[in-house]
Swiss-Prot record:
Reactions the enzyme catalyzes: a ubiquinone + NADH + 5 H(+)(in) = a ubiquinol + NAD(+) + 4 H(+)(out)
InterPro entries, A to Z: NADH_UbQ_OxRdtase_chain4L/K, NUOK/Mnh_C1-like
This protein's name: NADH-ubiquinone oxidoreductase chain 4L
Biological process according to GO: ATP synthesis coupled electron transport
The protein's assembly and partners: Core subunit of respiratory chain NADH dehydrogenase (Complex I) which is composed of 45 different subunits.
Amino acid sequence: MSLTYMNMFMAFTISLLGLLMYRSHMMSSLLCLEGMMLSLFVMMTITILNTHLTLASMLPIILLVFAACEAALGLSLLVMVSTTYGMDYVQNLNLLQC
């Protein structure tokens, strides 16, 4: 396992641990999810470049599209919760009535 893969795996693991430890605040959870998506993007890109898979070269772009959609939905939910309740606790998500 090369040093780059190990660094990206450690970044993914640290982001996952951060998501598990700081799950009470929504902003912390969103930042940890973005860190996980970034490390997945870099690992996928490096793997595709090292194996010369030209057919799979679109996969990192698709992952970035899903990451952008996740970030937009997460931030809109964060704004809605923080303006309604004045705080960004995840426990307030159960109180939302649409």
